[in-house]
UniProtKB/Swiss-Prot annotation:
Source species, domain of life: Bacteria
Pfam families: SfsA, SfsA_N
NCBIfam families noted in UniProt: sfsA
An annotated Gene Ontology molecular function: DNA binding
Name by which UniProt lists this protein: Sugar fermentation stimulation protein homolog
Protein family according to the UniProt entry: Belongs to the SfsA family.
Amino acid sequence: MIYNFIDSLIEGKFQKRLNRFVCNVEVNGESRLCHVPNSGRMKELLLPETPVLLQKKQGKQRKTDFDLALVLYEGHWVSVDSRLPNKLFEILVKKSLLPETSVAYGAEFLRREPSYGRGRFDMELMSTNSDRILIELKSVTLVQNNLALFPDAPTDRGRRHLEELTDSLREGYQPAVIFLVQRDDALCFAPNWEMDEAFSKALVQAQEQGVAVESYAFKVTPEGLNYCQRLPVTTQREVE
């Protein structure tokens, strides 16, 4: 296990999503407010009466008692926390768990959230050749027929990230976009052409220009997450 939940998760049932970041869950027979740490649609996951696991959270500024952590889908636990991939990939780098074919293999971790252009990326690394690597991480929860797909909702922000990663090539950076699949039933990753053609085209163009595109899947349990495998990436419109 490379990532463990600090406290035991609490069982519940999903009831209804109220907005992007708040839902109702049933805990011990009572309806409670719960924070949804993911702005994606997740329509195939968040169905009434679906078993979920929650993290108990406290704070004076909080309006909810829990964070939604895991959702059970067709016998597989799915981690829906979009903040988690940053922690997961940092662990993969620092513990040298990435395969030799990864752009970040053997790289040194430099810092989180480096500034670039009009915004920030998720992290910056230094390769064994002293090249600066800019990393943008994407959380993936959607899998159809063993194919992991991103995004599950249109994302102008995601498209801009790809364009800025491509721009960084001219300044000598080695940029990469990494799709972390927080479930273990995917065998391949692809952009979601049907949901967001503009993002998908931008991903193809970025890869053609030299942006590294990688994807990794994780085994999810009520105790935590473990690295599962690197997934092949296809950018074709249709996958046979």
